[in-house]
């Protein structure tokens, strides 16, 4: 799912990197670079912790860091709302809100759920997706368009998105019972959220497919020229 409009989709082949950048562009490059590093750290920690200490100890080693890294994504809603980036506010807010629910409303409230494989698979899906996405924006905003990053950006979601969504749904589902014991209304809210996930997931997935088609059309136009 995109949080920013692709700044390099219509760039002419052979165009040299920009020599000067506005404050806006420099800010976005820095923002995306920092987030790429943060999510790379999450990915590295998860991949190290699983074989070293097992799934049950992943959360103590990376949970707090992931929680605040994901919370930083609130800025993406602000970027879209203020026009700093050309991105659909609805889809941006939808993804950010769903992830905040997972890290704050579920795992933070019921940390024992993080011992399941669903938590680790969710983090892997999130972190790989975000490392690729933020790296892609760093390059394109800087005037580059690496083929490998572009390919990963618009193809890996076919695998990572279903993995992430299924992991999220599993965690939400397994939270309903302990949430009911804590507060009935919370369990009802989670059940409602699961129902929303069905159309919501479809919207986000088709949005990403539309972004991919847009890029493919742009490349065809460039080749024709």
Which ranges hold each PLM region?
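Eukaryotic polytopic
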Residues: 2-51, 55, 63-225
